Amino acid sequence: MSTIPVTIDFSGGAEFLVKAKAQKVQIPADSTLRDVLKFVRDNLVTDVHRINMLLNDDASEVAHGVITLINDTDTGLLLEYDTVIEAGDTITFVSTLHGG
């Protein structure tokens, strides 16, 4: 199976749930954003007790309050979870939830 290089970036508090704020990883070629969510769950999340702050229960969607960007474009303007990821893409997860 061939793979492609991508960068996955976390901010707005989401970085506290994973190994590092920005990570260069290899994912299977032809992956969609939904596949990336599962990759994040299975390979990058370190705080499994608070994963619901980033992803829903089956990692098919991001949690409410998390904005997802591909190359700085909101995925709502693309094909959302069906967007095919390309080599060199940057996928960013931004949590908009803040305590107070």
UniProtKB/Swiss-Prot annotation:
Family annotation (InterPro entries): Beta-grasp_dom_sf (IPR012675), Mopterin_synth/thiamin_S_b (IPR016155), Urm1 (IPR015221)
Listed Gene3D superfamilies: 3.10.20.30
Superkingdom to which the source organism belongs: Eukaryota
GO biological process: protein urmylation; tRNA thio-modification; tRNA wobble uridine modification
Cross-link (Glycyl lysine isopeptide (Gly-Lys) (interchain with K-? in acceptor proteins)), chain numbering: G100
Chief location bin: cytoplasm
PTM info: C-terminal thiocarboxylation occurs in 2 steps, it is first acyl-adenylated (-COAMP) via the hesA/moeB/thiF part of the MOCS3 homolog, then thiocarboxylated (-COSH) via the rhodanese domain of the MOCS3 homolog.
GO terms assigned for molecular function: protein tag activity
Annotated transmembrane regions: none
Pfam families: Urm1
Metabolic or biological pathway: tRNA modification; 5-methoxycarbonylmethyl-2-thiouridine-tRNA biosynthesis
Keywords: Cytoplasm, Isopeptide bond, tRNA processing, Ubl conjugation pathway
1-thioglycine modification, residue list: G100
Protease among keywords: no
Family: Belongs to the URM1 family.
Reported function: Acts as a sulfur carrier required for 2-thiolation of mcm(5)S(2)U at tRNA wobble positions of cytosolic tRNA(Lys), tRNA(Glu) and tRNA(Gln). Serves as sulfur donor in tRNA 2-thiolation reaction by being thiocarboxylated (-COSH) at its C-terminus by MOCS3. The sulfur is then transferred to tRNA to form 2-thiolation of mcm(5)S(2)U. Also acts as a ubiquitin-like protein (UBL) that is covalently conjugated via an isopeptide bond to lysine residues of target proteins.
Protein name: Ubiquitin-related modifier 1 homolog
Species in which this protein is naturally found: Caenorhabditis elegans
Taxonomic lineage from the root: Eukaryota, Metazoa, Ecdysozoa, Nematoda, Chromadorea
Gene that encodes the chain: urm-1
